Amino acid sequence: MSREIHNVLICGYGVMGQAVARTFAAAGFRTVIFSRRAASLTDLPPGSTAVNCLPDAAPDLAIEFASEDVGVKQAVFRHIEMAYPSNEVIIATGTSGLDLVELAKSLVHPERFVGLHYFMPADTSPLVEVMAGPSASVELVDHVAAAVAHTGKETVRLYKPMVGFLLNRLQHAILHEAYYLIDTGVASAADIDHAARRLLAPRMCLNGLIRQKDISGLNIHADAQRSIVPALFHNGIPNPMLQAMVARGETGLATGKGFYDWTGRDVKTERARASRELAALLDFLDELNREAEPEPPARNLPPR
């Protein structure tokens, strides 16, 4: 078992690095921020420090938030392992979509490697996914998840590496079909969002994906799968419509145009509103869950 996690090194101080540093510092972890801009940082979380070179004292957990590039992240890993060759430093990547198997190829100790997937805004979003690297043990995942939970987060533990973690895979599976329906003229973006907001998402809020099918009846669901799944859009490539929109600079709220017209809308105001409304919804769901009947235990079905 790895040593207890008390000292955390945050490598990179962009939006995500800042938010995650705040969560660890606020929870009482000794938090050091490694950034080339260390001397100019003025917004450090209380109790944290910033350095422009790796500190002499080895951290227990080092979390990198470098750009989403395999080579860049691997260079950070090498730098950390070279600085602390005789210490059992756990290295975590903050990637949301890169392959942990590929990232781990540069590591001397891949058995100490995990993925941590935070959701924006990372300091207030309640959930973090903790995923095993290709050589990491169940115990290591649980060990890191326990430290993350100490910062006030709920954790989803994934014991095998999988590109995209859990939530992104589910989200992209739904979105890939949604973009296909828009691209082929079956439904508009507004129609899809209306259906999601009025029924699909509320059902998920209350019963998730899988339990809802138990409630509805797996026999009905299995019958529907036989006719619907073969008709779903499976082409294995990113949606061309979406890629073309981004190439034209139509990236959504930030540029004023995406699937919706955001002309005249203030980016910070809109994002703050979305975060505020999500927080209010989560508070409501927490209250609802406290009053609800205990959930039935999930069965541990053997993997195929």
Give names to the regions the model predicted.
Residues S2-H6, I10-Y13, A19-R22, A27-T31, ...:
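NAD(P)-dependent Rossmann-like dehydrogenase/reductase catalytic/cofactor-binding core
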Residues R36, L44-I90:
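Rossmann-like NAD(P)-binding element
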Residues L41, I80, L103-A104:
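Hydrophobic packing residues within well-ordered alpha-helices of enzyme cores
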Residues A57, A92-N168:
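Rossmann-fold dinucleotide-binding core
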Residues I63-E64, T93-G94, H172:
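Redox-cofactor binding/interface segments in oxidoreductases and associated redox assembly factors
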Residues A66-V70, S96-L98, R265:
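Short glycine-rich anion-binding loops that position phosphate/pyrophosphate groups of nucleotides
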Residues A122-M131, T151, V156-V186, H194-G208, ...:
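Active-site-proximal catalytic alpha-helix in oxidoreductases
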